[in-house]
Amino acid sequence: MELLSPKPLCSVVNCEDLEKLDHVSALNELRREQEIFKLLPGIYAHRYDFRRVSPSIINDFEYCPRLLWVQHKLGLKLLSEKSVVSIIRGRILHERYERLLSQYENVVAEYKVEIGDLVGVVDLVIKRGGEYIPVEIKTGFSKEAHKTQLQIYISMLKARFGYLVYRNHVEVVHRNDAALDVLKKIREILSAREAPPAKCNSCIFKPICKNLL
């Protein structure tokens, strides 16, 4: 059997049983997958390859270019205590959804795409009529960074469109090669000697940026 188009996340898998996931359990689960260490109260970190296209690196760019620059210099991805629960909850839902949809003959989970020094892993790919259609699963609210990331994958796969799968709805996103300009801006920031302007306000990571600079 072949899949024509994906359905919303919570119409396919159980989302309710993870609502009571606590911080300690989430942190222990995350530590099973990679080395996580505590930098400051409420702040954790792990090693990260900044060549990889991910919602986190694009989110960081949109949230604060300086934070992205600092993380690159440290070689670390910074996590707030609050975000750890969201990460693990999202990861478990990802796995459940991917496991069910990968049973279709024309669906491939965790599809790696690589062009030059640009590396990405698409959650799901639907093979249809010689075209590879990317599907990204998102457990948070709809964000522009999600759309940008998917458009980058669409361009890399030379597809016409892709799908953003959220908890209760699915969005169709069409190809826009201008999204690749975001990667150019990110590369410029990562290669810069001086930090870009900050947008600190009440950012929890402010002490780390301040200490590095």
From Swiss-Prot:
Cofactor section: [2Fe-2S] cluster; Mn(2+); Co(2+)
Temperature dependence: Optimum temperature is 50-70 degrees Celsius.
Cofactor binding comment, as recorded: Binds 1 [2Fe-2S] cluster per subunit. Not required for nuclease activity, since mutation of the Cys residues leads to a colorless but active protein. Mn(2+) required for ssDNA cleavage activity. Can also utilize Co(2+) and to a lesser extent Mg(2+).
UniProt-annotated binding residues for Mg(2+): 94, 123, 136-137
Enzymatic reactions: exonucleolytic cleavage in the 5'- to 3'-direction to yield nucleoside 3'-phosphates
Alphabetical list of InterPro entries matching this protein: Cas4_exonuclease, CRISPR-assoc_prot_Cas4, Dna2/Cas4_DUF83, PDDEXK-like_dom_sf
Effect of residue 141 to A: Increased endonuclease activity
One Pfam assignment: Cas_Cas4
Activity-pH behavior: Optimum pH is 7-9.
Family: Belongs to the CRISPR-associated exonuclease Cas4 family.
Protein known as: CRISPR-associated exonuclease Cas4
Organism: Pyrobaculum calidifontis (strain DSM 21063 / JCM 11548 / VA1)
